[in-house]
Amino acid sequence: MHRLLLVAVVGAAVIACSKPAGGSTDGAAVFGSVCAACHGPTGKPDATMVARLGVKDLTDPALRPTLTAAHVEAQVRHGSANKLMPALEGALTDVQIKAVAAHVASPAFAPMR
């Protein structure tokens, strides 16, 4: 029950913050204002988010090869298969989704630990 409540609260927070100030189309800005709430400002979530929600560490070298722009874009648009990550299509513009996907997929993103 606690996990469900935590998922609901985090999901609501993400959606509430899902439109970056000024409608930014900069991938880093979108990540900082939307994704960082769960994944952390550098893509490395805190231990609580990992333990309680299974939030992925986007800087994990084992995960990085799977984080193509197309994969990240699909995750952002449709959410995760287990529904812990909410779908943000409609909350973010198409341009914002593509920008954040390119940002996360960029080789420069991983060293941001």
Predicted features along the sequence, with ranges:
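C-terminal motif of bacterial Sec signal peptides marking the signal peptidase cleavage site
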Residues: 13-16
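Sec-dependent signal peptide recognition
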Residues: 2-10
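Periplasmic/extracellular electron-transfer cofactor-ligation site
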Residues: 20-53, 78-84, 106-113
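Extracytoplasmic electron-transfer domains, predominantly the class I c-type cytochrome c fold
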Residues: 52-107
